[in-house]
Curated annotation (Swiss-Prot):
Its EC number is 3.4.21.92. It is an enzyme of class 3 (hydrolase). It comes from Chlorobium luteolum (strain DSM 273 / BCRC 81028 / 2530) (Pelodictyon luteolum). Transmembrane segments: none annotated. It is found in: Cytoplasm. It comes from the Bacteria. This is ATP-dependent Clp protease proteolytic subunit. Keywords: Cytoplasm, Hydrolase, Protease, Serine protease. Fourteen ClpP subunits assemble into 2 heptameric rings which stack back to back to give a disk-like structure with a central cavity, resembling the structure of eukaryotic proteasomes. Belongs to the peptidase S14 family. PROSITE patterns: CLP_PROTEASE_HIS, CLP_PROTEASE_SER.
Amino acid sequence: MANINFGFEHHASKLYSGAIEQGIQNSLVPMVIETSGRGERAFDIFSRLLRERIIFLGSGIDEHVAGLIMAQLIFLESEDPERDIYIYVNSPGGSVSAGLGIYDTMQYIRPDVSTVCVGMAASMGAFLLASGAKGKRASLPHSRIMIHQPSGGAQGQESDIIIQAREIEKIRRLLEEILASHTGKDVQQVREDSERDRWMNAEEALDYGIIDQVFAKRPAPEKKD
């Protein structure tokens, strides 16, 4: 069976991705202490962010990571189906099937999902960044965004390889159509632009339609009358 990925994770960014994941595994996750009338409670930083409806995607995208992201999205919808959810993206990309699972869940749930690039959104990371709610996709000013075509490996009999090659082409077309729908580009333009790695800074990603805003500083909350 073909294993289809956005290929960036498997060459230039392999060391980067591995370093992130190894660093998370080998370091202590910060804890946040909250005090109330009932005493103190300790939360790991990611659980505390989840209480604020913030999900952090900070690694390569595989089935395990996708399962965690999808579970958090569904949980937050059950908590409040009207309030926005925020996904902060710093990812080199990864598995297409895992990424599409996250994408479908983002579109399925009722709350708007706002996406913010912090550091890098490459490959499937860029795809998910662009998939946030229209008008609610952003990047910090020095982030890097990259799009390209998916890659996949195939083995077995010649007939099996042909079938798998056709499947990869179908997936490529699907991804191009989805990205075109979120950026306002036509499908052929997306195909040409993603033929090879296309790197963009935040302003270029804004011009391309992957994001809607570039934030140098978090906007101040609106004052209530």
